[in-house]
């Protein structure tokens, strides 16, 4: 993988793919890459995201994305090259927003007009 997403055709970049196809069509790596925003020197954001998922899978086989919820145990060292505490916080915030959205009660709308 190249060190920069700028070398990819624009249509193949995760953010552009999300806008064009919707989030359900992106891989877990692509969605994580969007949250991370940038890679690190010599490593693309896709590589960092892929390494993070592999790291979590190694620690919790079968855990997949759910294993990311346990990233809070990170201290000042990097879990994977290019992923420090600030990016871990971004991932945790995104995951917990998703959990809250999934757990939020669905409001029922009362329709008084059958044509509404």
Predicted regions and their residues:
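Long, charged amphipathic helices and adjacent flexible linkers at domain junctions
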Residues: 102-116
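Structured, non-catalytic alpha/beta "coupling" segments that mediate domain-domain communication
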Residues: 87-98
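Long, highly charged, low-complexity intrinsically disordered interaction regions
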Residues: 1-80
């Amino acid at each position: 993988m190249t060190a920069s997403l700028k070398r990819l055709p624009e249509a193949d970049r995760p953010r552009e793919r999300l806008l064009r196809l919707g989030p359900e069509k992106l891989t877990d790596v692509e969605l994580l890459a969007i949250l991370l925003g940038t890679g690190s020197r010599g490593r693309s954001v896709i590589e960092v995201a892929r390494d993070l998922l592999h790291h979590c899978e190694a620690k919790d086989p079968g855990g997949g994305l759910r294993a990311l919820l346990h990233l809070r145990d990170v201290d000042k060292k990097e879990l994977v090259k290019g992923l420090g505490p600030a990016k871990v916080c971004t991932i945790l915030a995104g995951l917990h927003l998703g959990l809250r959205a999934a757990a939020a009660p669905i409001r029922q709308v009362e329709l008084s007009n059958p044509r509404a």
